[in-house]
Amino acid sequence: TKPGEDVQKVQPTPTPAPQPTPEPVSRRGTAEPIPESVRASMQGKSMKTNSNITYDDLRYLTIPHYDFNYNVVTGHLVVADDVAEEVLDIFAELFDAKYPIERMELIDKYNADDFTSIEYNNTSAFNYRVVSTGSGKLSNHAYGRAIDINPQQNPYVYRNGTGAHENAREFWQRDVSKWSREIDRAAYIGNET
C-alpha cells in the first residue's frame, strides 16, 4: 500500500498451539540373538556348561507390559528360538488385555536362583536347571520352553495343597474371591476370574 491509502486491518487468525503427540506404545516386543553383554551375565548362572542347549538356540526378548501400578514398563525374557515369535504374540495379547506383571527380569539378576526369583514375584523363563522333584530330569526352563508369570499369584502348589513360598500362601487356595487385593486377582492366570 501507499502512504495515505486506507488499509483494511486484518486480524491474524491465531494458530493453535501444537499438541504433543504421544509416542505410540508398541504392543509387541522384539526378539534378537542373545547380545554378548547378556551372554556374559548368563554364563555360569542361568547358562551352565551343558551339551543340550547353546546361546544360538535361544532368543532375548524385550517385552512391554503393564506393572502392578498399570504403568507400561519394559521387561526381558530368554526363550527358545523356535517359540520366540509365539511368546511375543502371547505377551502382545496380555498387553492388550492390560494384564499386570509385577516384574520381568532375567533370572541371572537373582544369581539364577529360582527360589529367590519367585520370592520377588519375578516373571522369568530360561534357566538351565532340573525339576524340583529330585528326579534329576531337566526342567522345561532348561530349554527356554517354560515361563513362570507372576509366580506369587500363580504358585506351584504341591499335591497336599501347600507351596514353598510363604509370600504366596494366600494363593495356594485357588478361590480368588478370598484374595485381598484386586491386583492379585488380575494377575492370576485361571478360569475363575
Describe every region a protein language model picked out.
Residues 54-118:
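Active-site acidic/histidine clusters and adjacent loop/turn architecture
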Residues 8-10, 16, 152, 157:
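Intrinsically disordered, low-complexity Ser/Thr- and Pro-rich stretches
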Residues 131-138, 143-193:
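Catalytic cores and adjacent binding grooves of peptidoglycan-active enzymes
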Residues 4, 11-23:
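Ser/Thr-rich, Proline-interspersed low-complexity disordered segments
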Residues 23-66, 71-76, 138-139:
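Compositionally biased intrinsically disordered regions enriched in Thr/Gly
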Residues 36-37, 81, 85-88, 186-189:
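Generic alpha-helical secondary structure signal
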Residues 100-145, 151-156:
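Active-site-adjacent loop/helix surface patches within enzyme catalytic domains
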